[in-house]
């Protein structure tokens, strides 16, 4: 039986989010609707999640001493990592000492904090199909890996990066050195390690939101949302839609792969499992033990969106992954480099049928920074995609 206290009281149920961007913001709102006291942590002040939480804290989350000191001072019931750039050894130590419960587990946070841990788990421990890959620590190793194993074309990514940063495609030998330099510039930490992956000849890629939550029996069960299709540019998502049609054999295989990975990681919560699909063949790509950016579409497609599913699951509550309507999301970009922008055209965007928008409240805009998202539902995915894209195009951030 789950008991939830009253916020700001001695018996409050307290949840700390490490990382308070747009996804964390929605998780915090979902938790507050369930009566949870929330603590939003980020590396900079006035992050989107900090604007809605009961408490806001700003620290260097990659500093183990700062992270430990904050957790020991706040004593939350749960610590929920919402980004990868965290001092995970400190989380593992605190969990082992019984100081706090990490969602889904401290081990999962460590394994998924970079591409090496999770790729080795999927391919080498679990034997799941993946693209050919090698890890490299120098330009010379990268050249050797491409010539000896991976071949052309291939993709280079820092082992620690997000939202496509530092990711590039290599078509021939002349691209190798620029790709290495770009990967070094896109890493989240001072780390010269990269992964180089051979190209998979896939028809499409999906995100399969996978939820580990307690059912009526009290046992942890695995449930799946309908597959989410998405389009990326330079490794960063620009639109997503749900459901994405796929053969039953491929869907079954996708669920088998997602279940194998998430069961091994353990704990409770939502996982964004990314997969490549060609016909009935499926390859594992990545997994995040938290809501996924492509999953923002669920705010208009599901009875419980990915943030509500995550909040319920980590609190030990039942979940419902039922789809209620086809829908789509489209990114609203900053368009300008400025602080404290204003948004023109919101009224015109919301005049598009069956649409909604989310403006994230990021204090600083960049040309290619994701500042919001347009959402649309319709009788079919194609109509929803057109409407979401149209609504997004009508919102214009402006420097003042």
Curated annotation (Swiss-Prot):
UniProt keyword list: ATP-binding, Ligase, Magnesium, Metal-binding, Nucleotide-binding, Purine biosynthesis
Q: Which GO terms describe its molecular function?
A: ATP binding; magnesium ion binding; phosphoribosylglycinamide formyltransferase 2 activity; phosphoribosylglycinamide formyltransferase activity
Do you know which SUPFAM superfamilies this protein is assigned to? Glutathione synthetase ATP-binding domain-like, PreATP-grasp domain, Rudiment single hybrid motif
Question: What PROSITE patterns does UniProt report for this protein, alphabetically?
Answer: ATP_GRASP
Stretches assigned to the ATP-grasp domain: 120-315
In this chain, N(1)-(5-phospho-beta-D-ribosyl)glycinamide is annotated as bound at: 22-23, 82, 293, 362, 369-370
* Pfam families (alphabetical): ATP-grasp (PF02222), PurT_C (PF21244), RS_preATP-grasp-like (PF22660)
Gene Ontology biological-process annotations: 'de novo' IMP biosynthetic process
Lineage, top-rank taxon, reads Bacteria
- Listed pathway(s): Purine metabolism; IMP biosynthesis via de novo pathway; N(2)-formyl-N(1)-(5-phospho-D-ribosyl)glycinamide from N(1)-(5-phospho-D-ribosyl)glycinamide (formate route): step 1/1
The EC designation for this entry is: 6.3.1.21
Q: Name one GO cellular component term.
A: cytosol
Catalytic activity annotation:
N(1)-(5-phospho-beta-D-ribosyl)glycinamide + formate + ATP = N(2)-formyl-N(1)-(5-phospho-beta-D-ribosyl)glycinamide + ADP + phosphate + H(+)
Q: Where does Mg(2+) bind?
A: 274, 286
UniProt xrefs under InterPro entries:
ATP-grasp, ATP-grasp_carboxylate-amine, ATP_grasp_subdomain_1, PreATP-grasp_dom_sf, PurT, PurT/PurK_preATP-grasp, PurT_C, Rudment_hybrid_motif
**Similarity comment: family membership:** Belongs to the PurK/PurT family.
What role is this protein assigned? Involved in the de novo purine biosynthesis. Catalyzes the transfer of formate to 5-phospho-ribosyl-glycinamide (GAR), producing 5-phospho-ribosyl-N-formylglycinamide (FGAR). Formate is provided by PurU via hydrolysis of 10-formyl-tetrahydrofolate.
Subunit structure of this entry? Answer: Homodimer.
What is the name listed in the Swiss-Prot or TrEMBL entry for this protein?
A: Formate-dependent phosphoribosylglycinamide formyltransferase
Source organism phylogeny = Bacteria, Bacillati, Actinomycetota, Actinomycetes, Mycobacteriales
């Amino acid at each position: 039986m789950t008991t939830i206290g009253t916020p700001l009281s001695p018996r409050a149920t307290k949840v700390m989010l490490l990382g308070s961007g747009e996804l964390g913001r929605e998780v915090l709102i979902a938790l507050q609707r369930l009566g949870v006291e929330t603590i939003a942590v980020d590396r900079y002040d006035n992050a989107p999640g900090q604007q809605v939480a009961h408490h806001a804290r700003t620290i260097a989350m990659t500093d183990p001493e700062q992270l430990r000191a904050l957790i020991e001072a706040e004593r939350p019931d749960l610590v929920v990592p919402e980004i990868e750039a965290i001092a995970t050894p400190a989380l593992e130590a605190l969990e082992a000492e019984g100081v706090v419960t990490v969602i889904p587990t401290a081990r999962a946070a460590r394994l998924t904090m970079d591409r090496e841990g999770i790729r080795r788990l999927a391919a080498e421990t679990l034997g799941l199909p993946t693209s050919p890959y090698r890890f490299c620590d120098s330009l010379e190793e990268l050249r050797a890996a491409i010539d000896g194993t991976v071949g052309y074309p291939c993709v280079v990514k820092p082992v620690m990066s997000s939202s496509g940063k530092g990711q590039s495609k290599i078509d021939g030998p002349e691209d190798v050195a620029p790709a290495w330099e770009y990967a070094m510039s896109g890493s989240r930490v001072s780390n010269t390690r990269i992964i180089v992956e051979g190209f998979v000849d896939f028809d499409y890629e999906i995100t399969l939101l996978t939820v580990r939550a307690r059912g009526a029996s009290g046992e942890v069960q695995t449930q799946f949302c309908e597959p989410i299709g998405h389009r990326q540019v330079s490794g960063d998502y620009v639109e997503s839609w749900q459901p994405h049609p796929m053969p039953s054999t491929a869907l079954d295989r996708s669920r088998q792969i997602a279940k194998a990975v998430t069961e091994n990681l353990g704990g409770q919560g939502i996982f964004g499992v990314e997969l490549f699909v060609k016909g009935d063949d499926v390859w594992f790509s990545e997994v995040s033990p938290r809501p996924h950016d492509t999953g923002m579409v669920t705010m208009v497609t599901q009875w419980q969106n990915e943030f509500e599913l995550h909040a319920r699951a980590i609190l030990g509550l039942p979940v419902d992954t039922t789809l209620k309507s086809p829908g789509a999301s489209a990114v609203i970009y900053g368009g300008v480099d400025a602080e404290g922008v204003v948004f023109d055209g919101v009224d015109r965007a919301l005049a598009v049928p069956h649409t909604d928008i989310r403006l994230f409240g990021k204090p600083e805009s960049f040309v290619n920074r994701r500042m919001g998202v347009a959402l649309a539902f319709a009788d079919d995915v194609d109509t929803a995609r057109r409407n979401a894209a149209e609504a997004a195009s009508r919102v214009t951030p402006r420097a003042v």
